[in-house]
């Protein structure tokens, strides 16, 4: 898998078998991230076709895009608690089934509200995957490479996004349009959603091959099983000390509860930091590119075919930047990457705001010159790169490791739920802002949030590089 190519160097060679096994387990968990990205982006190429097929209003069409995010918030909120009660593996199995049901049902839907129900089911799966994959990976990975392995979640997400863009482009191209008949005489947009069934089945099959999280097993008082798994994950000279450390940590903690994240009726400061990181990750507007990319670039003056091709370019840049982040996150740390990313996003979003303002005609329609169009493309993809090398993967890394064992499950679920609520807000408001004020207003707002994110990280985020999960306070 891609993960093996990313992690080929020194660390794999030193403890070859255990390291490869760790990478394998992390890669399987990250398939949930792939489906997360795929399910989120597949609708990008079908928005116009759905509106025509269901004869829905612009508002209903917009809600059909954003509705998944409501399911995401619910799935993220409950996944951590379920994982603490039932285990990480059963929740991943349930997630795979939900992805499959959503993929099949979305393509079979005959009306907009039926379609929304299946998108909500997909949202439950995406929300759960956003919590359980980084949790599982952080609990099996040695601290020396935990950042890189945890970054596989974001790498898988962006590969999923690019895969959806490519599949949409190929299917729409072969059919002559997303609303045109494709295989078996069925509309192309249906096959876009059905294509997700393939990775869903792969995820389901691979989960059956992996063990439960050893840290969960220790909490469940199943130490012999945990020792057996840890023996395959760790070098012999650190096995006993790691088990002792986990045992001591488990003995000092109570069963995770959502009220544990409160002290004196107030949410713990560290949980607020996690929530704020999640919100800022969305408020810089990245998912406007991935949910409305084709609409955005057509508004900027590009044709439909070119807009879909730009989506593919955006997905490719996203993958490259995530690979760069994986190579850097354990070398220079989490906080420096976030600061650099915030600065880069503020600059590039500001450039886009200026370009959209200058190219707006008297009638409110954007008419870019060839020079402005090139500059907009460059600025947009530099923005995607800045996000992908920082806030994309690093927030997931931090959420997986910044909380201590006592509150980890509840805290991650709370932060991830906040992320999906923020995502929903951005997704729903973009068409409204676009219609009422134009692209320059939307991107001006995202620029402001990028600037604020820089100062937030500088003041409130602590470095977690090189620390054991049991050391987190």
Where are these regions (language model features)?
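Transmembrane-helix signature of 12-pass secondary carriers
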Residues: 2-473
């Amino acid at each position: 898998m891609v993960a093996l190519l990313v992690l080929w160097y020194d660390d794999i060679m030193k403890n070859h078998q255990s390291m490869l096994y760790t990478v394998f387990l992390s890669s399987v968990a990250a398939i949930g991230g792939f489906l997360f990205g795929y399910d989120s982006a597949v609708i990008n190429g079908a928005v116009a076709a759905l509106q025509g097929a269901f004869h829905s209003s612009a508002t209903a069409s917009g809600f059909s895009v954003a509705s998944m995010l409501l399911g995401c918030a619910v799935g993220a909120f409950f996944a951590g608690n379920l994982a603490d009660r039932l285990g990480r593996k059963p929740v991943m199995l349930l997630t795979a089934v939900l992805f499959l049901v959503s993929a099949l049902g979305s393509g079979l839907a005959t009306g907009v509200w039926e379609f929304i129900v299946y998108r909500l089911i997909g949202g439950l799966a995406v929300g759960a995957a956003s919590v359980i994959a980084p949790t599982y990976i952080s609990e099996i990975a040695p601290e020396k490479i935990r950042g890189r392995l945890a970054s596989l979640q974001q790498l898988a997400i962006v590969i999923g996004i690019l895969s959806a863009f490519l599949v949409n482009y190929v299917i729409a191209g072969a059919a002559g349009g997303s609303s045109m008949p494709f295989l078996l005489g069925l509309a192309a947009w249906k096959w876009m959603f059905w294509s997700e069934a393939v990775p869903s089945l792969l995820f389901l099959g691979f989960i059956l091959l992996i063990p439960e999280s050893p840290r969960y097993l220790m909490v469940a008082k199943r130490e012999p099983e945990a020792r057996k798994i840890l023996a395959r994950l760790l070098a012999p000279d650190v096995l006993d000390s790691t088990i002792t450390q986990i045992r001591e940590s488990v003995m000092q903690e109570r069963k995770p509860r959502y009220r544990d994240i409160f002290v004196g009726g107030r949410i713990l400061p560290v949980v607020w930091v996690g929530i704020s990181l999640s919100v800022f990750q969305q408020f810089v507007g990245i998912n406007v590119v991935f949910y409305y990319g084709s609409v955005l670039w057509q508004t900027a003056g590009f044709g439909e075919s070119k807009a879909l091709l730009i989506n593919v370019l955006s997905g490719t840049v996203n993958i490259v930047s995530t690979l760069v982040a994986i190579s850097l996150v354990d070398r220079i740390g989490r906080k420096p990457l976030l600061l650099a990313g915030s600065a880069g996003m503020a600059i590039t979003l500001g450039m886009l705001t200026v370009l959209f303002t200058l190219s707006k005609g008297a009638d409110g329609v954007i008419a870019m010159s060839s020079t402005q169009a090139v500059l907009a493309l460059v600025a947009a993809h530099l923005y995607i790169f800045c996000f992908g090398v920082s806030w994309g993967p690093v927030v997931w890394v931090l959420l997986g490791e910044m909380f201590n064992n006592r509150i980890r499950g509840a805290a991650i679920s709370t932060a991830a739920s906040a992320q999906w609520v923020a995502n929903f807000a951005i997704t729903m408001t973009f068409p409204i802002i676009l219609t009422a004020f134009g692209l320059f207003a939307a991107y001006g707002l995202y620029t402001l949030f990028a600037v604020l994110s820089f100062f937030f990280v500088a003041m409130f985020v602590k470095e977690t590089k090189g620390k054991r999960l049991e050391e987190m306070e």
